[in-house]
Structure formats: structure tokens, C-alpha cells
């Protein structure tokens, strides 16, 4: 894979983006994987392949074009006509997911610290705005800094329930409601598409800022491996306690609190941090699509953007997830298929290819 310090930083930043809108709360894993028993791990591997290999290809394209936003990469993948369609669909729905995460941060502040939802969302909005004033290298560093702590916490929870969980691996299929291979594969594809769509614009921009294609590709692949391991561990933890947490709003927090309330508190802080990661990455990508980063127009745009995001967050966390997530999974799968077609076509034509 050829990992170096820069590639590891890219990998952690990539993971930091996708877990915020993906599986940090555990609710998403409960919907897309856990109910399908051991078949769900096929879906986990499919999702990991999408994040790793397809992310690698896209990061290398971003490096080749020295991209600051996803526009040139979409043109390379789809051609000029269709790229505009996906450009506008992607950019506005990614902004919608950022709004969803702001709403989610308000709910998390309220549930864990009894802070009013509106105030929690406002705190997150202000922190995001202040971070967007920093240069891009500092933003990438901010995106990756929490990922190692998330890895440690997820491993701790998974190991604990490996030895103390009510349900063993051999009992999983007899406990969950649907042991369906088809659903495990299908929802793994959709979830992989969702996570990839969330990380797409950011991994393009990170790739554009990388020193070499080999480095950006290795970083994205490394991020995909970390993502797959974390996803499998969280899924396993939820399955070992499925009857107890199947109706929980934030299942991973319930698992952590069952071990020790202090672990629950630490996980709450980490969850807020990964939500911050996702909101930051998506808002930067949205602003960079319409303005030159750090120009006068950029500074005006991010003020308007963050005010709009805060106001729209009052629609509510659950309602926003129901509308956006499955649609974004389908959009992401269109991009994944297009990247694969481009990859194999250029390989087959024996052309010198970007990725």
C-alpha cells in the first residue's frame, strides 16, 4: 500500500468524514446490517470495498487534477453533460446531510448533557464556522485527529462484549429478525453508496492537495480498511446485545453506558467530534464548489451557508435521516458504478489512465 505519514493522515481524515454520517451512533448500523445476522458481514465487506478501492480511485483522480472541489472529477467520470446533473444532486444533498448532522449534534447535546437542542446545534454551527476560517491543511488535520480515539473506543466496546455479550456468534442468526443473504448484500451496497457519497467531495479535495497519486490512493485505501474493521466491530457489538438495544435511539451509547457511565461520557464526546468532522468536511466541500476557498466571496458564503444550515436543522434529526439517507445511497452507487466502468474501460483499452 506504500503508507507514509501523509497517507495515514489522509486515511484518518477520510474515515473521520464517513463515520459521522455513517455509524458513530450505531443507529445506521442497526438499520442496514445488524438485523441480517451473519450475512450482514458480506455487506460490511462490500461497503468496505466501496470505501477503500473506489475511494482510492477517486482520490488519485483528485490528485491528477489538483482538484479543490469535485467538479473536474465528475466531468472525468461522467462526461460534461451528465456530470452537471450529478454535481447539483450531490452538492445539495451533501449539504442536506451536513444539516442533518447539525440537528443530530443538537439532539446529542440534549440527551447527554441536558443542553437545549437549539443551543447544542448553535454551538456546533459556530465551531464549524470558526474552523472553516482555517487553511485547508489545518482542516484536514482537524478531520483526522479524532479517528484514533474512535478506533480505541470501538475496539474497547467490541472486546468487552466479545467476552460478556448475552449472545454468542453461533447464536446470532437465531436471535435477529431476518437472516437474509440477499438483504445483507443489498443493504451493504446501499450503505456503501451512502458512505462513499458522503466522503466523495472531501476525498477528491484531499486527493487534490496530496503530493502524489500513489500517496492519495494509499491513504484512501487505508481509510477503507479502517472503516471496514470499525463497521464490523460495531455490528458485532450490537448483535451480541440485540434484544436489549434494538429499540434504542443511540445504541452504541447504550452499550458504552452499560460498561461504565464514564465510558459513555467519553463516547458521547467522541460522537460529537465525529459529527463535527462530517459537518466540517461537507460544508467545506459545499463552499469550495461555489467559491474560491478563502476569497472574500468564500468568507461571505460560509456565513450565509452556516446560518441557513442552522435554521434548516430545526426540521429534526430523524425526519432528515428518513428523507436523505437511502436516496444518497442510490446516488452514491451510481457514482461507484461509473468509476468502475471508467476504470475497466481504460484498462481494457490499454490506455494510460489516471485511476
Show where each model-derived region lies.
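Helix-loop-helix connectors at the membrane interface of multi-pass transporters/channels
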Residues: 71-77, 101-121, 208-228, 281-304, ...
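Juxtamembrane transmembrane-helix boundary signature
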Residues: 45-71, 233-237, 241
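Hydrophobic, membrane-embedded alpha-helices of multi-pass small-molecule transporters
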Residues: 5-24, 43, 90-94, 98, ...
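Transmembrane-helix boundary/entry motifs in multi-pass membrane transporters
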Residues: 2-5, 35-39, 64-93, 111-117, ...
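Membrane-water interface regions at transmembrane-helix termini and the short interhelical loops
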Residues: 34, 61, 101-111, 125-146, ...
Amino acid at each position: 500500500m506504500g503508507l507514509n505519514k501523509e497517507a495515514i493522515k489522509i486515511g484518518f481524515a477520510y474515515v473521520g468524514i464517513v463515520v459521522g454520517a455513517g455509524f458513530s451512533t450505531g443507529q445506521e448500523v442497526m438499520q442496514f446490517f445488524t438485523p441480517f445476522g451473519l450475512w450482514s458481514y458480506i455487506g460490511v465487506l462490500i461497503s468496505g470495498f466501496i470505501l477503500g478501492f473506489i475511494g482510492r480511485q477517486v482520490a488519485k483522480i483528485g490528485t491528477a487534477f489538483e482538484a479543490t472541489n469535485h467538479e473536474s472529477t465528475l466531468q472525468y467520470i461522467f462526461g460534461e453533460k451528465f456530470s452537471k446533473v450529478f454535481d447539483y444532486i450531490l452538492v445539495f444533498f451533501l449539504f442536506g446531510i451536513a444539516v442533518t448532522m447539525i440537528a443530530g449534534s443538537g439532539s446529542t447535546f440534549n440527551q447527554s448533557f441536558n443542553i437545549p437542542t437549539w443551543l447544542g446545534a448553535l454551538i456546533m454551527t459556530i465551531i464549524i464556522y470558526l474552523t472553516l476560517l482555517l487553511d485547508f491543511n489545518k482542516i484536514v488535520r482537524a478531520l483526522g485527529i479524532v479517528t484514533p480515539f474512535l478506533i480505541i473506543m470501538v475496539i474497547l466496546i467490541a472486546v468487552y462484549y466479545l467476552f460478556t455479550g448475552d449472545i454468542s456468534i453461533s447464536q446470532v442468526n437465531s436471535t435477529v429478525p431476518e437472516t437474509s443473504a440477499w438483504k445483507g448484500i443489498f443493504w451493504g451496497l446501499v450503505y456503501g453508496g451512502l458512505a462513499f457519497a458522503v466522503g466523495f467531495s472531501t476525498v477528491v479535495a484531499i486527493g487534490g492537495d496530496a503530493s502524489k497519486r500513489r500517496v492519495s490512493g494509499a491513504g484512501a485505501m487505508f481509510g477503507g480498511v479502517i472503516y471496514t474493521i470499525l463497521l464490523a466491530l460495531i455490528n458485532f457489538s450490537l448483535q451480541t446485545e440485540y434484544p436489549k438495544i434494538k429499540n434504542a435511539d443511540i445504541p452504541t451509547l447504550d452499550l458504552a453506558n452499560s460498561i461504565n457511565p464514564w465510558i459513555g461520557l467519553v463516547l458521547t464526546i467522541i460522537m460529537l467530534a465525529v459529527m463535527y468532522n462530517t459537518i466540517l468536511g461537507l460544508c467545506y466541500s459545499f463552499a469550495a464548489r461555489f467559491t474560491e476557498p478563502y476569497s472574500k466571496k468564500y468568507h461571505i458564503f460560509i456565513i450565509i451557508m452556516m446560518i441557513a444550515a442552522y435554521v434548516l436543522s430545526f426540521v429534526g434529526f430523524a425526519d432528515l435521516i428518513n428523507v436523505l439517507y437511502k436516496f444518497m445511497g442510490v446516488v452514491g452507487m451510481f457514482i461507484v458504478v461509473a468509476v468502475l466502468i471508467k476504470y475497466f474501460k481504460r484498462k481494457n483499452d490499454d490506455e494510460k489512465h489516471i485511476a
